[in-house]
């Protein structure tokens, strides 16, 4: 049965590992179309701090699912799965192969395994939770979550109001915890998937790449990009867009919480931590072929052979 399913390629990896370069090279050799799997690239006007592919790169290899939302909006794993499946179907209908590229592991997981049947958001209950947070504080609500769902509470930081609110909301709507509901998996992906991950073999090299990229972003005008977002007045640090690595730290600088140099240092550290989490997740991933960032030619050959032999 799986032999009749269309082929899809996953190219995963930590930030600054060379995914975009490899994807563009691959598109120049094969009939693949790129779908971005990145929770930061979805936002318009957030180009420099997300290291979004530039005009030249996009002309060589257009990316779907970038620049689809305003930074004031939210986007869930369910939203991604819906949009990605539609994009994949469109690509296959054109006789091409979907190539999904990015580092948002939760999106890949949602796409592969489907989503558990969580209740839809309830604005009334959400408003009630936010009002409680104003009067009691999020730390008290986090303690409440510890009582009803210790597993989720261990994963959700007290300073993450979006996820904390959602966990409490799910329980109040359904009477079941987020942990209980997420153990029920949804519909699996109707594709034959070949999965690849690219990263430097040496962690110090990845750290060097991250620091270099952050410096280049600052030189390219990241501070000015951030100031434009800050000046809008309708954005705030609890939004998913502003919680993106780099943006949160630059917001703190513009808010007067730290100096510019401290913001850059914090941004680099936060990016390293993100990369570490991405690699940890990938190491537990099944059916994954690892590629070396320091040998793009070999990585290209490995992926090319996998496509040609299909």
Curated annotation (Swiss-Prot):
Residues given in the record as ATP binding sites: 13-20
Record GO biological process: tRNA modification
InterPro entries assigned: Dimethylallyltransferase, IPT, P-loop_NTPase
GO MF terms, alphabetically ordered: ATP binding; tRNA dimethylallyltransferase activity
Entry binding sites for substrate: 15-20
EC number from the UniProt entry: 2.5.1.75
Site positions for Interaction with substrate tRNA: 104, 126
Region called Interaction with substrate tRNA, residue ranges: 38-41, 162-166, 243-248, 276-283
Catalytic activity of the protein: adenosine(37) in tRNA + dimethylallyl diphosphate = N(6)-dimethylallyladenosine(37) in tRNA + diphosphate
Entry keywords, A to Z: ATP-binding, Magnesium, Nucleotide-binding, Transferase, tRNA processing
Gene3D superfamilies: 1.10.20.140, P-loop containing nucleotide triphosphate hydrolases (3.40.50.300)
Source superkingdom: Bacteria
Keyword ATP-binding: yes
One Pfam match: IPPT
Necessary cofactors: Mg(2+)
Record-stated family: Belongs to the IPP transferase family.
Assembly with partners or alone: Monomer.
Annotated function: Catalyzes the transfer of a dimethylallyl group onto the adenine at position 37 in tRNAs that read codons beginning with uridine, leading to the formation of N6-(dimethylallyl)adenosine (i(6)A).
Designated name of the protein: tRNA dimethylallyltransferase
Organism of origin: Vibrio parahaemolyticus serotype O3:K6 (strain RIMD 2210633)
């Amino acid at each position: 049965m799986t032999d009749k399913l269309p082929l899809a390629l996953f190219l995963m990896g930590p930030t600054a590992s060379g995914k975009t370069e490899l994807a563009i090279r691959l598109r120049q050799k094969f009939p693949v179309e790129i779908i971005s799997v990145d929770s930061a690239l979805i936002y318009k006007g957030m180009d420099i701090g997300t290291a979004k592919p530039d005009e030249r790169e996009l002309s060589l290899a257009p990316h779907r699912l970038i620049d689809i939302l305003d930074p004031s909006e939210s986007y869930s794993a369910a939203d991604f799965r819906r949009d990605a499946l539609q994009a994949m179907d469109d690509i296959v209908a054109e006789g091409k192969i979907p190539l999904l590229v990015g580092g948002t592991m939760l999106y890949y997981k949602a796409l592969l395994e489907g989503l558990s049947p969580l209740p839809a958001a309830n604005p009334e209950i959400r408003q009630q939770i936010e009002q409680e947070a104003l009067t009691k504080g999020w730390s008290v609500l986090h303690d409440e979550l510890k009582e009803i769902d210790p597993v989720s509470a261990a994963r959700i930081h007290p300073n993450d109001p979006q996820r904390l609110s959602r966990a409490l909301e799910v329980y109040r709507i359904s009477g079941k915890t987020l942990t209980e509901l997420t153990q029920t998996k949804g519909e699996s992906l109707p594709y034959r998937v070949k999965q690849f991950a690219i990263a430097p073999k040496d962690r110090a090299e990845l750290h060097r790449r991250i620091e270099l990229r952050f410096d280049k972003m600052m030189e390219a005008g990241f501070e000015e990009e951030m100031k434009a977002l800050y000046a809008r007045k309708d954005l705030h640090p609890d939004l998913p867009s502003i919680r993106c690595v780099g943006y949160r730290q630059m917001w703190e600088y513009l808010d007067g919480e730290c100096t510019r140099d401290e913001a850059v240092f914090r941004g680099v550290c936060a990016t390293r931590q993100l990369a570490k989490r991405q690699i940890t997740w990938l190491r537990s991933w099944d059916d994954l072929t690892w590629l070396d960032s320091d040998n793009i030619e070999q990585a290209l050959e490995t992926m090319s052979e996998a496509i040609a032999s299909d």
